Amino acid sequence: MEESSLSRAPSRGGVNFLNVARTYIPNTKVECHYTLPPGTVPSASDWIGIFKVEAACVRDYHTFVWSLVPESVTDGSPIHASVQFQASYLPKPGAQLYQFRYVNRQGRVCGQSPPFQFREPRPMDELVTLEETDGGSDILLVVPKATVLQNQLDESQQERNDLMQLKLQLEGQVTELKSQVQELEKALAAARQEHAELAEQYKGLSRSHGELTEERDILSRQQGDHVARILELEEDIQTISEKVLMKEVELDRVRDSVKALTREQEKLLGQLKEVQADKEQSEAELQMAQQENRRLNLELQEAKDRQEEQSAQAQRLKDKVAQMKDTLGQVQQRVAELEPLKEQLRGAQELAASSQQKAALLGEELASAAGARDRTIAELHRSRLEVAGVNGRLAELSLHLKEEKSQWSKERAGLLQSVEAEKDKILKLSAEILRLEKAVQEEKTQSQVFKTELAREKDSSLVQLSESKRELTELRSALRVLQKEKEQLQEEKQELLEYMRKLEARLEKVADEKWSEDPATEDEEAAVGLSCPAALTDSEDESPEDMRLPPYSLCESGDSGSSPATGPREASPLVVISQPAPIAPQLSGPAEDSSSDSEAEDEKSVLMAAVQSGGEEANLLLPELGSAFYDMASGFAVGPLTEASTGGPATPPWKECPICKERFPVHTQTHTYTHTHTHA
């Protein structure tokens, strides 16, 4: 029906058209297979049209169909699809070239096919020439294309059955793979659920780990603050200790000075007692010393002024202590000067007054020194209390710090252990998750490979099935064409038979006239008619299958002793009927046409006898056939007639088939050649 071109079309936009034939028969639907490249997104607005080759615009299409959008599209793999053009929309047969074009929704041509034609099959297309080499000799066989197509149809049917079995096996494998995929999906779902649970646990552990880390950071900061506070307290304690030491040193100095002053006071008291004793002794001299006493009162007034000045300078106690020492030295000097005044009353009274004044001053200074000492002692006591409080607080803080350190160490050790345990668990879970992910990935890869292989096998099966269907359609169309031609041949055959009957009637009239003129010739022709193949008409009518003559061969063996009884008419010239092999029975084949073929052969035999007996009568009877048929018929008989007329060697008038023992005239080589091949 059509000759397929398995080469793929060159693609301008990536779309490849597969199995595009060079010719298509009209009035039969056309199936178009194409492949979209990876990355192409098919749309329901895309369409495939049949265009003329010279068409320059997408609107110049003859017909089109919308493209089919696949249900499942795999990323990274080509998409195979097919569409069908109905027979009523196809172009009319002719020499015009067409091609498929894929147009996307933007109106851009994404691919085109090789050109093809729509035409009816020609009569010469129904014959196929086969060349075979057998035993070193080339044999050229010309057989009907229907036989070849029938063989191809049988092979396609067998291949289709094999493909169906393979499809069933693949469907079984697909079912098994689907069950395996479902099991793997269930396992994957369980693994994902377990992975989700592990992820939740991991998140919980991560949150707890984060909280513990934050607590650890807070404790670390608190520890740093406590350590800084402890360092500050230690520095404060060190400073206070230094201050306490300084105060103690200063207190020791004050105590030493107080002791010295106390000793001096005792000395002064002893001197005062001595002075009082001297005073009692010098009362007599008191009057003499009144004037000196007035002067001493003035000095006392001056001393009071100085006392006021010293009270103003009470805050500068430390400086006045030195002045007191100087004053005490002066007092001592003055006391030392009092001894010579014992003799002199005035000097003694003056010294007594001054001593009293100085004693009062010293008493006040001692009182202020005692107050300062008490204040210093109170401050020292307060400092000691502060130091004791600070030490107690420091001890408490140190104890609390030690407790916090021990507790923090314990918590840190526990946290480290828990973190290590969680890390181990996380590592184990990560390894398990990686293993599961790897297994799932491998299963996905295998399932993807299986799906790809199944899709490829399915596509190839669909393509082969569509090819088989297309070839089957072609074969059916060819068979319909053959049936039509067979009907035409039958009609022509019927016309030829009618024409042969008319010729037979004319030949019978001519033969009657000729036989009435020459009885001897009539008897001879009757004898020859009994022995020639035309006498086998009855047997051929009884068995029409024997009239199917296969290709020619030569029967070399003959039996000369099996000839019938000879008579006086044997020496007369023989009328040889050359009977070529019929062509119509080989082409038609059915057994019910054999009877009509045998009748046609009888008519041809009579016609050939008439032609060989006289060319003029044949020309009168067959004006339509002309001289060509006469030359062909007379050519078969010229050889035997020439040999008989030249008086060659005597040969038996009959030949016998070694298989069926059927007898033939010696000179009918063509019929013998044809008959022998019926047994081959």
Curated annotation (Swiss-Prot):
GO terms for molecular function: RNA polymerase II cis-regulatory region sequence-specific DNA binding; transcription coactivator activity; zinc ion binding. The keyword Cytoplasm applies. GO terms for cellular component: cytoplasm; nucleus. It comes from the Eukaryota. A zinc finger (UBZ1-type) spans 654-679. Keywords: Activator, Coiled coil, Cytoplasm, Metal-binding, Nucleus, Phosphoprotein, Transcription, Transcription regulation, Wnt signaling pathway, Zinc, Zinc-finger. The modification Phosphoserine is found at residue 4. Zn(2+) binds at residues 657, 660, 675, 679. Residues 511-606 are annotated as: Disordered. InterPro entries: CALCOCO1-like, CALCOCO1/2_Zn_UBZ1, SKICH, UBA_autophagy_assoc_protein. Residues 501-680 are annotated as: C-terminal AD (CTNNB1 binding site). GO terms for biological process: positive regulation of transcription by RNA polymerase II; Wnt signaling pathway. Residues 1-30 are annotated as: p300 KIX-binding. Residues 145-205, 232-339, 417-514 form a coiled coil. Residues 1-190 are annotated as: N-terminal AD (CTNNB1 binding site). The keyword Ribosomal protein does not apply. It is found in: Cytoplasm; Nucleus. Belongs to the CALCOCO family. Part of a calphoglin complex consisting of CALCOCO1, PPA1 and PGM. Interacts with the bHLH-PAS domains of GRIP1, AHR and ARNT. Interacts with CTNNB1 via both its N- and C-terminal regions. Interacts with EP300. Interacts with CCAR1 (via N-terminus) and GATA1. Functions as a coactivator for aryl hydrocarbon and nuclear receptors (NR). Recruited to promoters through its contact with the N-terminal basic helix-loop-helix-Per-Arnt-Sim (PAS) domain of transcription factors or coactivators, such as NCOA2. During ER-activation acts synergistically in combination with other NCOA2-binding proteins, such as EP300, CREBBP and CARM1. Involved in the transcriptional activation of target genes in the Wnt/CTNNB1 pathway. Functions as a secondary coactivator in LEF1-mediated transcriptional activation via its interaction with CTNNB1. The C-terminal activation region (AD) is used for downstream signaling. Seems to be essential for coactivator function with nuclear receptors and with the aryl hydrocarbon receptor. The N-terminal activation region (AD) is necessary and sufficient for synergistic activation of LEF1-mediated transcription by CTNNB1. Contains a EP3000 binding region which is important for synergistic cooperation. This is Calcium-binding and coiled-coil domain-containing protein 1. The lineage of its organism: Eukaryota, Metazoa, Chordata, Craniata, Vertebrata. The gene is CALCOCO1.
